[in-house]
Amino acid sequence: MLFPPSLPPTASGRSLGRVETPPGLVRFMVGLAEAPKGGRVLEPACADGPFLRAFREAHGTGYRFVGVEIDPHALDLPPWAEGVVADFLLWEPGEAFDLILGNPPYGIVGEASKYPIHVLREVKGLYKKTLSTWKGKYNLYGAFIEKSVRLLREGGTLVFVVPATWLVLDDFSLLRSFLAREGRTEVYYLGEVFPGRKVSAVVLRFRKGGKGLALWDTRRDGETFTPLLWSEKPEWKGEIIRFETGWTREMEASGPPLGSLFHIRFAARSPEFKKHPAVQKEPEPGLVPVLTGRNLKPGWIDYESNHSGLWMPKERAKELRDFYATPHLVVAHTKGTKVVAAWDEKAYPWREEFHLLPKEGVELDPLFLVEWLNSDKIQEYVKTLYRDFVPHLTLRMLERIPALLPRKGNTERRKHGPYTSPESAGSF
């Protein structure tokens, strides 16, 4: 057994990714949980075992209860449960479980200056070697999901409450495929249920063996959650999970997805700009502001304000990204899931946002498309499908947005003049 790293005396619940679960949510999850009499029931990152206690109260005493906790000071289980001080992600119990339930820690493991879960950064390399779904800036809760699935018996059940980000983010693509291979996945959308936390949550109910996906909405009345089946996908292979409707399917059938028309690029990052010899921190003649998301407005770009604190010669911006030299479509990455688009006629340097370059042979009226992307219809489309799963529009979400093209025979085209104010944008 691998025991946890030596935790600093100042290790806190926050630095370990711990968040208290509201009692009503615990009861809802226990209602989704099941195990055979005499079965083994596990709560990872258990602290005082709220899920074990609630399950025993609801289902009785005929089970073997185990709790694993990395922080010995937080472990406080009742005498009828076995408590284990260990790093759950590296723990090897030698025996499988019939039910695993709880609220795993969430956060990214890394340096204290950037990431909340910094006390585990020394063992991050071991996590990556041990787990097959680790990808990108993997959130710790994804690692807990994979580890738990591996510890289940065939036919065993996992019930976790986790952030909704895994439904759509690329960092969790390996996890979604893993779940699809290993069993049947059910997702219960909750929204923001943790007091004081701007995190949209879902309950994941997974049964090892079987296949397919079921997506549930929930209706909340005080501390009571009522599930409402939204959709089922018997042949789910790990694709992103969305609240599809007949209307969203009609929308997507109405035009080609943006990803089929454009190469979608992301801006150069702040460190790249700061290392570039032509970038200055004070304005000088011949320099232009490096633009950020705050310069991007629906249908127009504020070329005058400087929110980055950086200036550079416009003609040298292409040294950071070649597309900076070409007028192109810019779509917000930093406006929540709201779609905000404008045509960058002046071809300025950007520190943020998505930059869309037409693929070879694609001819478009960019300003017609800008108007469509900023429309109420597109905002409703995105909100319907993705609700508040993630704080920002993602590449995969953007790629799927249908492009409305001008009707054939409509030869009237807008002039491609730069729009630098709300008034000029509204005139096209």
UniProtKB/Swiss-Prot annotation:
Keywords: DNA-binding, Methyltransferase, Restriction system, S-adenosyl-L-methionine, Transferase. GO terms for molecular function: DNA binding; site-specific DNA-methyltransferase (adenine-specific) activity. One of its GO terms (biological process) is DNA restriction-modification system. The keyword Chloroplast does not apply. SUPFAM superfamilies: DNA methylase specificity domain (SSF116734), S-adenosyl-L-methionine-dependent methyltransferases (SSF53335). Transmembrane segments: none annotated. This is Type II methyltransferase M.TthHB8I. The gene is tthHB8IM.
